[in-house]
Amino acid sequence: MFKLPELGYDYDAVEPYIDAKTMEIHHSKHHNGFVMNLNSILEKMGKIHLTDVSNILKNIHDFPEEFQTLIRNNAGGYSNHTLYFRTLRPGNKDNLFEKFKDDINAAFGSLDVLKANLKDTAMKIFGSGWAWLVLCPESGLKVISMPNQDSPLMNSYKPILGIDVWEHAYYLKYQNRRIEYVDAFLKALNWEEVSKVYNEVIN
């Protein structure tokens, strides 16, 4: 059975970039909704004992076909948001670990180029979805987009950071100004925490 992960910080901790009300609704309503729905689906399948969301998403086609879309949406939503909120955790956000920095420079040229790629990808998403920095087994670090709540894990990519461009992530503060939200998210992003995610993925 899955549980809503604790944020580990207050809802207003990401101000002024993302407002407290948005953070509260996003975490306690949307993220929690994916948790509750995922548990309900697993219970219906007699799989409530499953607790590794990565394995669920990687092996989604092993589940009955009538449940696969529900699993994709809700296991994806759970996994995506868990990483999203983790990487917004306050801290030494400009502390990019040396190995991660070297690999970013090798793949993109610089951190600024990576940020520009993420922003461009986020802005090109039509409707709802996510812009991702992922580690691809064949080609290393790359920026991709995924629609809706689809997880990079379904494609054997390892997610490092994700920008949620569903309107629920920003509409209270930014309305239709997605570009301002994306800029704000990149300013709020804790690169030390993202570096820790990267270390976990490569080790």
UniProtKB/Swiss-Prot annotation:
Signal peptide: none annotated. It comes from Borreliella burgdorferi (strain ATCC 35210 / DSM 4680 / CIP 102532 / B31). Homotetramer. One of its GO terms (molecular function) is superoxide dismutase activity. Binds 1 Fe cation per subunit. Belongs to the iron/manganese superoxide dismutase family. Destroys superoxide anion radicals which are normally produced within the cells and which are toxic to biological systems. Pfam families: Sod_Fe_C, Sod_Fe_N. Its cofactor is Fe cation. Keywords: Iron, Metal-binding, Oxidoreductase. It catalyses: 2 superoxide + 2 H(+) = H2O2 + O2. This is Superoxide dismutase [Fe]. Its EC number is 1.15.1.1. It is an enzyme of class 1 (oxidoreductase). Fe cation binds at H26, H81, D164, H168. One of its GO terms (cellular component) is cytosol. Induction: No inducing conditions were found; seems to be constitutively expressed (at protein level). Part of the secA-sod operon. Expression is partially under translational control of BpuR; increased levels of BpuR lead to decreased expression of SodA (at protein level). Transmembrane segments: none annotated.
